[in-house]
Design a protein with these regions (language model features):
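Short helix-boundary/capping micro-motifs
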Residues: 12-29
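A short LG(V/I)-centered, amphipathic sequence patch enriched
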Residues: 41-61
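Alpha-helical linker/hinge and terminal dimerization helices associated
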Residues: 43-44, 66-88
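Central regulatory/effector-binding core of bacterial HTH transcription factors
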Residues: 92-154, 216, 222-223
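A late-sequence structural motif
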Residues: 107, 256-282
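Hydrophobic hinge/microswitch elements
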Residues: 130-143, 149, 201-258
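Flexible hinge/capping segments at coil-to-helix
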Residues: 155-193
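Secondary-structure junction motif
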Residues: 178, 192-213, 279-282
Length: 282
């Protein structure tokens, strides 16, 4: 049994049993992977994968247990490397983060700047995606940390730590009627709304607030990016609902932000990492 064989069966599962995609991601050949899997199955005396002709179609019952153990072994191997790096050069290495646009654009820049000043020999790598995508990256150990408000709780193998609470603001053009009256859910629901796609930046709590009052918001446009939302508010498509931290009066001229924290429950941004991961000192 070879470590490489364990990596192959683990990666095949991450690529939905697609051997070609697995080979491409590992910069190796499809026949080479198939041969190593057959050798491992022959050594173990069982099939890890069920097949239809040459295609892998499912994981066998025993294969599921084997792959779970393989994932732990691969994680332990990575931890061994981290321990060695920490012992030889504790301030040198790499750090990979997966997060959403809102966090990358509005929250992390000052944090990243301070980190890079404190650890100039650590290279940083940032991946952006949906909350589900970045949670999967952390669960699969493809990044060190995932930072998001949604989806992390769906993965049992992730440790989650709350980082900060935030709420929302209503974004309107200068002179909008909502600026002249108390802000209510009824008033917001009466307007065309531009906001986040479901599953992004606390959108689920937004929908729950309206549903709790028996209201159906008139959402006319959705996006994953607060900058895009503000652009379409400027175009007159509707009023925007975004994270308050994504509004900057100096940069967002021509727009006004109305605090809506009394209407919606706080959202909590969390940092998640794979359970059992050895964390470097930095």
């Amino acid at each position: 049994m070879k470590l490489q064989q364990l990596r192959y069966i683990y990666e095949i599962v991450q690529h939905d049993l697609n051997v070609s995609a697995t080979a491409e991601s590992l910069y190796t050949s499809q026949p080479g992977i198939s041969k190593q899997i057959r050798l491992l199955e022959s050594e173990l005396g069982l099939e890890i994968f069920e097949r239809n002709g040459k295609h892998l179609v499912a994981i066998s019952p025993a294969g599921k247990e084997i792959i779970a153990i393989a994932a732990k072994v691969l994680g332990d191997v990575e931890n061994i490397r981290r321990v060695a790096q920490e012992a030889t050069d504790p301030k040198r290495g790499s750090l990979s983060i997966a997060t959403t646009h809102t966090q990358a654009r509005y929250v992390l820049p000052p944090v990243i700047r301070k980190f890079m000043q404190a650890y100039p020999a650590v290279s940083l790598h940032m991946n952006q995606g949906t909350p589900m995508q970045i949670s999967e990256l952390a669960a699969q150990r493809r990044v060190d940390f995932a930072i998001a408000t949604e989806a992390l709780e769906l993965f049992d193998d992730l440790v989650m730590l709350p980082v900060f609470r935030w709420n929302r603001s209503i974004i309107v053009p200068e002179g909008h009627p909502l600026l002249d009256r108390p802000l209510t859910l009824e008033a917001i629901a009466s307007q065309p709304i531009v906001t986040y796609v479901f599953g992004f930046t606390g959108r689920s709590q937004l929908d729950e607030a309206f549903a709790g009052q028996g209201l159906k918001p008139h959402v006319v446009f959705t996006a994953v990016d607060a900058d895009v939302i503000k652009t379409y508010v400027r175009l007159g498509v509707g009023i925007g609902i975004i994270a308050s931290l994504a509004f900057d009066p100096a940069e967002d001229r021509g727009l006004r932000a109305i605090d809506a924290s009394h209407l919606f429950s706080d959202s909590v941004t969390k940092i998640g990492f794979r359970r059992g991961t050895m964390l470097r000192s930095y």
